[in-house]
Amino acid sequence: HLNSVMNDKEIRAQYEKSLNLLTSHYGKIGQNKKLFSQYEKLYEQNRKNLTQSQNKLLENVLRGFRLSGVHLNVKKRKLFRECQEKLAKLESKFEQNILDSSNSWAKNFKTIENLKGMPQSSLEIAEETAAKRNEVGYTLTLDQPCYMAVMTFADSQSLRKTMYLAYASRASNKFPISCKWDNTKIIENILLLRQEMSQILGYKNYAEYSLATKMAKSTNEVIDFLESLKIKAISKSKKEMSVLKNFAKKHYNLKTISPWDIAYIAEKYKEENFGISQEE
């Protein structure tokens, strides 16, 4: 958490160092056969006398050992740990690229003219941001509070579009500042490592491996649930979008609603019909 909210070179270096140590440490614990056998012994000898919650706790611990590869031979255990460590580094780099690309983007306005509709609290933060950057006026960033305030309240469709496209393309080859933080290759490598780790443990794919700790019993069960949910969600969302489109056409002369318009129009609709505001 600290690495995300107070990120600098020193904290990042310590975070990377600690991440490597922790990943290695927990990987070795998860594959400690002696420790596993003690937990297994504790469970087998006492499960009849333990409460349901206590048994469940021990079962989860034992499952964690198995999902760490405790049952594998020496060669496969070593390979699995190597994959874990590589994966941890890639996931960390993935997050850093998003953070770095987000921090690289900012838009300054000398006056409040283009920021009409924005709440006073958001304008004050934008003013403080500008001052910290030795800029005059108001500076917007891709930080979540600032981004959501613009998408929800800014009257300028052009500003909302600019912010939306920048935010949606962070850490990609479409990012307007630079593509040096592009996560495409990292995502591909993460998927390959997850697949390799899953197969080492005897699963067909990462989805099956992931379900080992979840209530759903199979990938088909998950897909069926999502398909069922999709049907209900699409039906409901089409009705809601129809309402918003009619409202936008009537009050803002918008023939179509773009992704960067949805939060704004929805907010105006709530204010108009229910007398409530997200800011309040």
Q: Where are these predicted regions, by residue range?
A:
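A conserved hydrophobic secondary-structure block that centers on an alpha-helix together
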Residues: 69-83, 170-192, 196-209
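Active-site-proximal, well-structured secondary-structure segments within enzyme catalytic domains
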Residues: 53, 57-59, 86-89, 96, ...
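Second-shell loop/turn segments in exported
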Residues: 66, 148-150, 176-180, 211-222
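Acidic, low-complexity proline/glycine-rich segments
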Residues: 44-60, 141-162, 194, 199
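N-terminal helix-rich structural modules
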Residues: 1-118
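Active-site-adjacent "gating/activation" loops or surface patches in catalytic cores
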Residues: 132-171, 262, 266
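Membrane-interfacial loop-to-helix junctions in multi-pass inner-membrane proteins
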Residues: 9-19, 182, 225-228, 249
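Short, charged, low-complexity loops and linkers
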Residues: 40-45, 140-147, 168-185
